């Protein structure tokens, strides 16, 4: 029984203690997550560990560390295991799987088939058992009042009933009360134990004394069901969210609270977070007022208490919830009892509010830059704009300064500036190196579906991107865009108005010669594109395309005569689609018009008068596209009817296209090229990509698609094959060269995708010439023996194609990500050109993941895409990760996600 005059005061003790300790954990996490310098290595003990009081608190806290690596249940009374297994069985019974078709290699046992991240730890932090007397007392209180007992699940703690029990209780009916002997207080999900609790209102003092223990299960007991659901859904929760959810266990020697000033103090506090699986301690924890906290002799780690491999120690930490900032003094990062990093002072955030301060530093080694260390500093200038200034220190170059500025406006969009400057680069003949990039995005608040963007890019030289991107994460773009653009769309029109020019970097063309002015792209000053449809006819589809632009390209090196001017292209089409479940037929008529006009400089350069500089041409086009759909239940040849089941779809298709020849040799080519051959291209209306040429095409294209879908909806086979046959030779050329389409056919084209087993995928596509020699072939084999391993092998071979500027290539690609055991894995990726006998790109690394830390060491060797004749860049990188700190994303994972098909789910399985 709790006397009513004690209710509010004991609540203050409980909330003062728990709120203080919870904030301590949250502060440590936020500090390291967003503002701590990146740790290099880590440790387990510190200068305060010899303190007997601290050791006693840690020893008491360790009672809640359960050495049960096989369990997924974060509670000491593990009654939910059977529930978890039962739910897992139910889930498996509801999930359709093709159990009769085995996974390849399922019985080989060459690699671990599962990686259990929980087994990497010796145990886990668990909540103490709930006090059964609390719920019983709540039920009895409700019954005595003739009311049902309140449902405690989801009820805010400040609204939940307060329950207290002890061996002895005294109250003088005025201002003094005392509970002693096995004192227990419960309210909602919060629980406190002590040997004695004293309340003296005359002196304004409340205290909990002797073996104080408190818990805050604000997220509720982590039952087996909740844990299993989180695993099945691969759910991810941010560190800040986890800290805010509670899940705290704490022990202390005593707690003191001043009821008049609100000041509270705890000594020899040890705490653990169940959600974060982290723990720590503070020699003294003081709250002078409701918004300020002072911690002395602080430790924090996510390692097991029995084997603390790393930890952060601080002489003192001051937290201010009003400003959202914290200050740490004399902080040491330790690994295996060895201090490896020290900061005398740093300022960090304790909530989601931004604040100025140092960010995580980076370090790398490469053949271009030697050792590079980057130290960024963040400026929180205003709620809607900020900046980051970084200093880059190189062993082989002078220091470089780079900066980033971000802004967000209410009505004018958002943008970001990035720039850098390196004076007198010793590795680049003493030249200054610099860059500037700008991106802006805007959406209208007054006109729906109207948006805009602006982009600017500049680098000082062609080698800049390659030299200052250690692992080659940025695209080595030949033409850096500078663009301003407006976009609008609705149900009937999709429009784009833009002005665009480029900075073209020095590079080699396909013949190994330096690019000339004639090889550079045209600027569009401006260009207007419209795609529209007319809603007039009920059964007809009437659509149009309009592309108008002024193209400009100055020729200063005499590589060719200048050919700049305006181009107007329009196409109006009418089709009458007839569709049914068994097939379709789509006749279509189109009329195209192309008008070009040279500007004054081009007229002079080409010795043309104004009339000769204007060209206009009309080309009509007619086409019929028809197809059938045949459906049949069962598997191919009945081979899998008893196992996979499913159905088959056979879809033959035939398209006929006719457009007459119109001479266009005097029309300039601003940005048009011939499309690469593939299955879908055979059914398009033109082989020209761009609107400078109107193709004369008289051809028919037969094709067929076959699909097999099993009973679970998995497409086991999807294959297509087609060939375009030319009735008349094509006469339109790109650049006054010989006609392109003068053969009898395009050659055979195919595209197939197969999944013969649940963990094997095979993709093959290719094309033959009209004489049935090989044009190109690409294959990709993906094998995933387990959730955390992946093997890819690919092959590509293509012949030179003068029409499409396709270069010959014979290359092998391969990648592998696989665990050696529960802690170690190998990552590798490569691309080999066996015509040149040259490894174009290779990466190999090892990755280690432990209970509370991980690291990776990897190297990459790759060639500059802009100049394959250059020497390859070689880089070695090392990463250290501390569990529970940081986002988990790294340069290595970003690189592999781009290079390795299917890497991201494998990465999630390894981490989770």
Swiss-Prot record:
- Superkingdom assignment: Bacteria
Pfam families membership: LptD
Major location, coarse class?
Answer: membrane
Flavoprotein among keywords: no
Secretion signal, residue range per the UniProt entry: 1-27
Q: What GO CC annotations are associated with the protein?
A: cell outer membrane; transporter complex
An example GO BP is: Gram-negative-bacterium-type cell outer membrane assembly
Keyword Membrane belongs to the record: yes
Entry's localization field: Cell outer membrane
Q: Keywords in UniProt for this one? A: Cell outer membrane, Membrane, Signal
Subunit structure of this entry? Component of the lipopolysaccharide transport and assembly complex. Interacts with LptE and LptA.
Q: What family classification does the UniProt entry report for this protein?
A: Belongs to the LptD family.
HAMAP family recorded: LPS_assembly_LptD
PANTHER family tied to this protein: LPS-ASSEMBLY PROTEIN (PTHR30189), LPS-ASSEMBLY PROTEIN LPTD (PTHR30189:SF1)
* Function text: Together with LptE, is involved in the assembly of lipopolysaccharide (LPS) at the surface of the outer membrane.
In Swiss-Prot or TrEMBL terms, this protein is called LPS-assembly protein LptD
Q: What is the phylogenetic placement of the source species in the record?
A: Bacteria, Pseudomonadati, Pseudomonadota, Gammaproteobacteria, Moraxellales
């Amino acid at each position: 029984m709790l006397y009513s005059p004690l209710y509010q005061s004991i609540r203050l003790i409980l909330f003062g203690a728990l709120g203080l300790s919870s904030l301590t954990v949250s502060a440590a996490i936020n500090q390291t997550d967003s503002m701590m310098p990146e740790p290099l290595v880590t440790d387990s003990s510190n200068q305060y560990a010899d303190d007997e009081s601290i050791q006693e608190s840690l020893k008491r806290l360790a009672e809640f560390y359960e050495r049960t690596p096989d369990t997924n249940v974060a509670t000491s009374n593990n009654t939910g295991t059977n529930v978890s297994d039962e739910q897992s069985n139910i889930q498996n019974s509801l999930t359709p799987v093709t159990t009769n078709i085995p996974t390849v290699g399922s019985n080989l046992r060459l690699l671990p088939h599962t990686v259990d991240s929980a087994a990497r730890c010796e145990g886990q932090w668990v909540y103490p058992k709930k006090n059964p007397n609390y719920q019983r007392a709540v039920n009895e209180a409700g019954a005595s009042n003739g009311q049902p007992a309140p449902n405690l699940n989801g009820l805010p703690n400040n609204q939940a009933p307060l329950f207290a029990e002890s061996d002895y209780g005294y109250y003088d009916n005025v201002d003094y009360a005392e509970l002693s002997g096995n004192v227990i207080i419960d309210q909602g999900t919060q629980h406190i134990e002590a040997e004695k609790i004293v309340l003296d209102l005359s002196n304004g003092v409340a205290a909990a004394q002797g073996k104080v223990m408190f818990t805050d299960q604000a997220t509720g007991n982590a039952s087996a069901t909740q844990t299993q659901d989180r695993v099945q859904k691969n759910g991810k929760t941010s560190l800040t969210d986890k800290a805010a959810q509670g899940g705290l266990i704490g022990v202390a020697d005593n707690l003191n609270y001043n009821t008049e000033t609100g000041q509270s103090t705890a000594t020899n506090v040890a705490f653990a977070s169940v959600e974060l699986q982290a723990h720590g301690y503070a020699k003294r924890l003081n709250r002078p007022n409701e918004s300020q906290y002072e911690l002395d002799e602080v430790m924090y780690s996510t390692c097991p208490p029995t084997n603390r491999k790393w930890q952060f120690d601080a002489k003192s930490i001051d937290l201010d919830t009003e400003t959202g900032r914290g200050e740490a003094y004399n902080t040491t990062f330790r690994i295996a009892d060895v201090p490896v990093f020290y900061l005398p002072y740093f300022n960090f955030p304790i909530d989601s509010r931004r604040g100025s301060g140092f960010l995580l530093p980076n370090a790398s080694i490469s053949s271009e830059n030697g050792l590079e260390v980057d130290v960024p500093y963040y400026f929180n200038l205003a709620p809607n704009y900020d900046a980051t200034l970084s200093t880059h220190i190189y062993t082989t170059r002078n220091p470089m300064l780079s900066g980033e500025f971000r802004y967000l406006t209410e009505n004018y969009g958002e943008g970001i500036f990035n720039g850098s400057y390196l004076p007198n680069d010793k590795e680049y003949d003493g030249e200054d190196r610099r860059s500037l990039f700008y991106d802006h995005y805007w959406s209208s608040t007054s006109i729906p579906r109207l948006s805009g963007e602006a982009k600017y890019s500049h680098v000082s030289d062609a080698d800049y991107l390659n030299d200052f991107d250690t692992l080659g994460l940025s695209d080595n773009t030949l033409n850096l865009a500078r663009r301003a653009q407006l976009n609008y769309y609705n149900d009937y029109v999709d429009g784009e108005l833009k002005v665009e020019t480029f900075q073209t970097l020095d590079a080699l063309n396909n013949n190994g010669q330096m690019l000339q002015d004639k090889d550079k792209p045209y600027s569009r000053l401006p260009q207007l594109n419209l795609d529209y449809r007319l809603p007039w006819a009920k059964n007809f589809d009437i659509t149009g395309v309009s592309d108008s632009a002024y193209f400009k390209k100055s020729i200063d090196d005499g590589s060719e005569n200048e050919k700049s001017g305006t181009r107007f292209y329009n196409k109006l089409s009418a089709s009458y689609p007839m569709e049914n479940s068994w097939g379709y037929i789509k006749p279509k008529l189109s009329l195209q018009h192309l008008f070009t006009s040279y500007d004054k400089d081009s007229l002079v350069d080409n010795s043309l008068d104004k009339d000769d500089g204007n060209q206009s041409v009309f080309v009509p086009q007619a086409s019929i596209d028809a197809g059938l759909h045949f459906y049949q239940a069962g598997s191919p040849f009945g081979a899998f009817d008893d196992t996979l089941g499913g159905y088959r779809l056979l879809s033959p298709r035939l398209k006929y296209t006719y457009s007459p020849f119109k001479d266009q040799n005097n029309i300039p080519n601003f940005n048009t090229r011939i499309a690469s051959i593939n299955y879908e291209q055979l059914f398009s209306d033109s082989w020209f990509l761009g609107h400078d040429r109107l193709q004369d095409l008289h051809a028919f294209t037969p094709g067929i698609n076959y699909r097999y879908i099993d009973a679970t909806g998995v497409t086991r086979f999807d294959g297509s094959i087609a060939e375009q046959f030319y009735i008349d030779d094509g006469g339109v050329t790109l650049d006054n060269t010989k006609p392109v389409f003068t053969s009898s056919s395009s050659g055979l084209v195919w595209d197939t995708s197969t999944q013969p087993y649940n963990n094997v995928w095979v993709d093959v596509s290719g094309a033959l010439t009209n004489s049935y020699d090989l044009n190109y072939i690409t294959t990709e084999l993906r094998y995933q023996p387990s959730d955390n391993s992946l093997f890819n092998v690919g092959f590509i071979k293509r012949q030179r194609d003068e029409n499409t500027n396709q270069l010959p290539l014979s290359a092998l690609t391969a990648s592998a990500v696989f665990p050696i055991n529960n802690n170690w894995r190998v990552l590798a990726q490569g691309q080999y050109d066996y015509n040149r006998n040259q490894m174009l790109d290779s990466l190999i690394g090892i990755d280690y993941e432990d209970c509370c830390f991980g690291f990776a060491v990897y190297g990459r060797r790759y060639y500059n895409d802009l100049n394959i004749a250059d020497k390859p860049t070689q880089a070695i990188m090392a990463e250290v990760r501390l569990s529970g700190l940081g986002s988990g994303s790294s340069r290595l994972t970003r690189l592999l996600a781009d290079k390795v098909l299917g890497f991201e789910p494998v990465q999630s399985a390894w981490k989770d």
